[in-house]
Swiss-Prot record:
It catalyses: a lipid X + a UDP-2-N,3-O-bis[(3R)-3-hydroxyacyl]-alpha-D-glucosamine = a lipid A disaccharide + UDP + H(+). It is an enzyme of class 2 (transferase). GO terms for biological process: lipid A biosynthetic process. Condensation of UDP-2,3-diacylglucosamine and 2,3-diacylglucosamine-1-phosphate to form lipid A disaccharide, a precursor of lipid A, a phosphorylated glycolipid that anchors the lipopolysaccharide to the outer membrane of the cell. SUPFAM superfamilies: UDP-Glycosyltransferase/glycogen phosphorylase. This is Lipid-A-disaccharide synthase. Belongs to the LpxB family. The gene is lpxB. It comes from Xanthomonas axonopodis pv. citri (strain 306). The lineage of its organism: Bacteria, Pseudomonadati, Pseudomonadota, Gammaproteobacteria, Lysobacterales. Coiled coil: none annotated.
Length: 439
């Protein structure tokens, strides 16, 4: 991973593969994933997909759009949401039926989920797809992929589980289920290669969506803040458990920062109404001035763009903060028993937790985990960013290089890889037909 930000960064005289910096464009064809020739197939391909979350629905829609450019008459069916339906996917079940979180909720819905999975795989097998694509949701998708692969259907898993962080041996088991794994991060394919699994780095769609140069002034105008304001964005998580563990600590840290920066504005985006209610309760018992605390409905990216510094939980949000080029402080806590078990068994294989730090193999953002995640230590780390603009400036080229590394037109690359798998399947069928005719 060392030096990842410098490898093929694609920023030369303000351009990337012919695209101007800050724009999102279609990448050039990938040499090792040749596009199929339209009309060369005997029939249009049938492609089945499952996306079990909103993020997967968006990924699925982008992939379908790119596959349709290659196969205009292709048929798409599966489990998805509004985004996939909007690009012509016939959804047999809605993605919301898979949207369960937490062990208790999963157990409560397990009989229904097992029944749905059984019904889907039987129906898709009868439909005879050329390929099945499971998008994220590994607990649901990998068993479906394995079952279909055993019956001769080509399978793809889009979005690798975090095999680089823990339980690396899962890579081999994933290979039993998927003919091809599409990875969002460059450190993932080498791990799969060690286990004999075909995995391709396609880039991260979020890196495609976010411009290289962010507009802080526009974000502040959207939120009614002046360009000269001092702003901290606070994101304790998007789940009830995370917010319960981190919210009070984060808001106490923000108050300590405000003691040094009296005109500080604090932006708190809430992922959903349930999170908003919990965050409102935590804010009400904090010492933060009401007039300078802004609880938002969603708008996490806008809050990050408007901020000078971001305080957030470890997770995908750290990647988003990196892509909008904001200095951050990362905190996280898990249940004490969970933490002891993980440490005792050595389940985690990484020394860093925040995605920017993992991608850079360097400490770009302070990480304060478990017992170190205290208001006082968070405050010290935050003030270090606020009071040293030279450090913030030095961070920008590092973030920009990582952004370029991930910005590969992910949907197009993923479609190229799927097209290659379809071509392999068709070649195999033609070879069998030729052998049969010769006999």
């Amino acid at each position: 991973m060392k030096g990842i930000g410098n490898r093929e960064s694609g920023i030369v005289d303000g351009q990337r593969n012919g695209a101007s910096v800050g724009s999102v464009t279609t990448a050039l064809p990938i040499p090792d994933s040749p596009l199929p020739i339209p009309g060369a197939r005997k029939r249009a391909p049938r492609i089945a997909l499952i996306a079990g979350e909103a993020s997967g629905d968006i990924l699925g829609a982008g992939l379908i759009e790119q596959l349709r450019l290659r196969y205009p008459n292709a048929e798409f069916v599966g489990i998805g949401g509004d985004a996939m339906r909007g690009v012509g996917c016939q959804t047999w079940f809605d993605a919301s039926e898979l949207a369960v979180m937490g062990l208790t909720e999963v157990l409560r819905h397990l009989p229904r989920l097992l029944k749905l999975r059984s019904a889907f795989r039987e129906r898709v097998l009868a439909w005879k797809p050329d390929v099945f694509i499971g998008i994220d949701a590994p607990d649901f998708n990998l068993p479906v992929e394995r079952w279909l692969k055993q019956r001769g259907i080509k399978t793809v898993h889009y979005v690798s589980p975090s095999v680089w962080a823990w339980r690396e041996k899962r890579a081999e088991k994933i290979g039993v289920s998927a003919d091809l794994v599409l990875c969002l991060f460059p450190m993932e394919p080498p791990i799969y290669a060690k286990h004999g699994v075909d995995a391709r780095f396609v880039g991260h769609p979020m890196a495609d969506d976010i411009a290289y140069q962010s507009d802080r002034a526009a974000a502040r105008a959207t939120l009614g803040l002046s360009a000269s304001s001092t702003v901290l964005a606070v994101l304790p998580g998007s789940r009830h458990g995370e917010i319960s563990r981190l919210g009070d600590t984060f808001f106490q840290a923000a108050w300590l920062v405000s003691e040094h920066l009296p005109n500080l504005h604090v932006l708190v985006p809430a992922a959903n109404p349930g999170c908003k209610q919990l965050l409102a309760e935590q804010l009400s018992r904090s010492s933060l001035p009401v007039m300078r605390s802004h609880l938002l409905d969603g708008q996490a990216r806008t809050a990050m763009l408007a901020a000078d510094v971001v305080l957030l939980a470890s997770g995908t949000a750290t990647l988003e903060a990196m892509l909008v080029k904001r200095p951050m402080v990362v905190g996280y806590k898990v249940a004490p028993l969970t933490y002891r078990i993980v440490k005792l068994l050595g389940l985690l294989k990484v020394n860093r937790y925040a995605l920017p730090n993992i991608l850079a193999n360097d400490d770009l953002a302070p990480e304060l985990m478990q017992d170190d995640c205290t208001p006082e230590r968070l405050c010290v780390a935050l003030l270090d960013w606020f009071k040293h603009p030279d450090k913030v400036a030095a961070l920008q080229p590092r973030y920009l290089a990582l952004h370029a590394e991930l910005r590969r037109d992910a949907s197009a690359r993923a479609a190229d890889a799927v097209a290659g798998l379809l071509s392999q399947r068709e070649s195999g069928m033609e070879n069998r037909e030729s052998a049969g005719a010769g006999a």
